[in-house]
From Swiss-Prot:
Pfam family, one: Hydrolase_4
Classification of source organism: Bacteria, Pseudomonadati, Pseudomonadota, Gammaproteobacteria, Enterobacterales
UniProt xrefs under InterPro entries: AB_hydrolase_fold, Hydrolase_4, MAG_DAG_Lipase
Additional remarks: In addition this protein catalyzes a transacylation reaction to produce acyl phosphatidylglycerol by transfer of the acidyl residue of 2-acyl lysophospholipid to phosphatidylglycerol.
Protein name: Lysophospholipase L2
Name of the top EC class for this enzyme: hydrolase
Parts forming coiled coils: none
Gene label: pldB
GO cellular component: membrane; plasma membrane
């Protein structure tokens, strides 16, 4: 186990050998399934389980992501003794789409994501044999998971958030953005169309990406979408942007309602989500008497948005922190709720 964690620090040195060997063998052990989400949308998920594991991590990905991208993270957690479940949110990955153009990143209500996660938890997570249940959520998945826990307090033993989407970086004054979004909301042709500056999925060169400094991981993730057109998602709709901004506001408004042990990891070189909202969330949790781990975000120095797909030096720091955090919340006692 300790060697496993040490390997995180040098994996990129032989990344191709790892992905084509041990990681491919591990991925073949997956069990893929689906459940019916809000409005009868099929929601896909994947699971990795072993009889001797008594803890589970539910991974809640970010916008456009599919569970196929999370094989490496699942491998690392599984080999430390965690079962792993990963959900593909509605409108992306292998789950059902909502609009005729499958590349459009869209949701009717942000709460639909939250309700899907609640149904998933009730059907797949809560009835399971595990002694401890954790969430590891990234970006949009962080907003979804946090809203879920605010509405269903006590169902999860601990949550780790990487670059959670509590606010979005929009390169215009907020009043102007709101005017545009409100106007688009009243005009369906624009409401359900690509937000300005975005469009259908296309492969972007590594040199201009703002997600990771790891060339190997970036190219591997790009290959998933290049090889399987069915999982491609492009830019968001105006309505998705509006719903997501409102969701971030809901997260902050309810920050004091949830006492779940929380670790919040922040990317120092963030370009996608608004780090100021992480700081505000932590302040609100502290004021409510439920401070996050350390009382503030754990800043991963030098990291772009996708912290767990970063270069080994940054990824290993984050992953060690997450695993150590989950291990600190592994005592047999506790008052976790069994109701969702």
């Amino acid at each position: 186990m300790f060697q496993q964690q040490k390997d995180w620090e040098t994996r990129e040195n032989a990344f191709a050998a790892f992905t084509m060997g041990p990681l491919t063998d591990f991925w073949r052990q997956r069990d893929e399934a689906e459940f019916t989400g809000v409005d009868d949308i099929p929601v896909r998920f994947v699971r990795f389980r072993a009889q001797h594991h008594d803890r589970v991590v539910v991974i809640c990905p970010g916008r456009i992501e599919s569970y196929v991208k999370y094989a490496e993270l699942a491998y690392d957690l599984f080999h430390l003794g965690f079962d792993v479940l990963i959900i593909d949110h509605r409108g992306q990955g292998r789950s059902g789409r909502l609009l005729a153009d499958p590349h459009l990143g869209h949701v009717n209500r942000f709460n639909d994501y939250v309700d899907d996660l609640a149904a998933f938890w009730q059907q797949e997570v809560q009835p399971g044999p595990w002694r401890k249940r954790y969430i590891l959520a990234h970006s949009m998945g962080g907003a979804i998971s946090t809203l879920f826990l605010q509405r269903h307090p006590g169902v999860c033993d601990a949550i780790a958030l990487t670059a959670p989407m509590f606010g979005i970086v929009i390169r215009m004054p907020s009043f102007m953005a709101r005017q545009i979004l409100n106007w688009a909301e009243a005009h369906p042709r624009f409401r359900d169309g690509y937000a300005i500056g975005t469009g259908r999925w296309r492969a972007l060169p590594f040199a201009i990406n703002v997600l990771t400094h790891s060339r190997q991981r970036y190219r591997r993730n790009l290959r998933f979408y290049a090889d399987d057109p069915t999982i491609r998602v492009g830019g968001p709709t105006y309505h998705w942007v509006r719903e997501s901004i409102l969701a971030g506001e809901q997260v902050l408004a309810g920050a004091g309602d949830d006492a779940t042990p929380t670790l919040l990891l922040q990317a120092e070189e963030e370009r996608v989500v608004d780090n100021r909202m992480h700081d505000r969330f932590c302040e609100l949790r502290t004021a409510a008497g439920h401070p996050v781990e350390g009382g503030r975000p754990l800043v991963i120095k030098g990291a772009y948005h996708e912290i767990l797909f970063e270069k080994d030096a940054m990824r290993s720091v984050a992953l060690h922190a997450i695993v150590d955090f989950f291990n600190r919340h592994n005592s047999p006692s506790g008052n976790r709720s069994t109701e969702v």
